[in-house]
């Protein structure tokens, strides 16, 4: 059976935690995307940082190794909805944390008009009123792929869905 893996942090905080411009920018992002704490923001920054690091190392790699890995990375980022179809590694280097935060379920629920505010979207998700293709998702930080984006709706058993059907 084996030993369980050691749980590791999935984020890395800022190197200088008290720089005013960093604090102001983080606070603005927390409010814009309805994040609960800075750890959620740092997790997104870490994911983007890893993608960009991967792209930089691929740009430095020899051509025969680079082609297959580059195609896999670009395909993955396209499926996540972070890049357009004909993107290159230079586009990966231009990714920002806002690009990733736009793909969170919380943001997509708000942008689709299923919630009145970004905070309301978070509450709907946590309380189980939101589903993707009929499957209930209760994590506001869930990264919605390009295929799933059109399938985001109220859960089948949600009273919100029933009230909309009655109005129609």
Swiss-Prot record:
A GO cellular component entry from the record: small ribosomal subunit
Protein's GO biological process: ribosomal small subunit biogenesis; translation
CDD domains recorded: S4 (cd00165)
Residue span(s) of domain S4 RNA-binding: 103-167
GO terms assigned for molecular function: rRNA binding; structural constituent of ribosome
Keyword rRNA-binding found: yes
Protein's UniProt keywords contain Ribonucleoprotein: yes
Keywords: Ribonucleoprotein, Ribosomal protein, RNA-binding, rRNA-binding
Similarity-based family: Belongs to the universal ribosomal protein uS4 family.
Summary of subunit composition and partner proteins: Part of the 30S ribosomal subunit. Contacts protein S5. The interaction surface between S4 and S5 is involved in control of translational fidelity.
Task performed by this protein: One of the primary rRNA binding proteins, it binds directly to 16S rRNA where it nucleates assembly of the body of the 30S subunit.
Protein name: Small ribosomal subunit protein uS4
Gene: rps4
């Amino acid at each position: 059976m084996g030993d369980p893996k050691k749980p590791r942090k999935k984020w890395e905080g800022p190197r200088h935690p008290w720089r005013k411009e960093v604090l102001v920018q983080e606070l603005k992002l927390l409010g814009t995307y309805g994040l609960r704490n800075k750890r959620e923001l740092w997790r997104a920054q870490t994911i983007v940082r890893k993608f960009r690091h991967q792209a930089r190392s691929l740009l430095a790699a020899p051509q025969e190794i680079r082609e297959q890995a580059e195609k896999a990375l670009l395909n993955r980022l396209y499926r996540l909805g972070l890049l357009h179809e004909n993107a290159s590694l230079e586009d990966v280097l231009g990714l920002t944390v806002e690009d990733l935060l736009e793909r969170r379920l919380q943001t997509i629920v708000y942008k689709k008009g299923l919630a009145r505010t970004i905070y309301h979207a978070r509450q709907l998700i946590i309380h189980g009123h939101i589903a993707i293709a009929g499957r209930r998702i209760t994590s506001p930080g869930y990264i919605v792929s390009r295929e799933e984006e059109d399938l985001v709706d109220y859960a089948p058993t949600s009273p919100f869905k029933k009230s909309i059907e009655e109005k129609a």
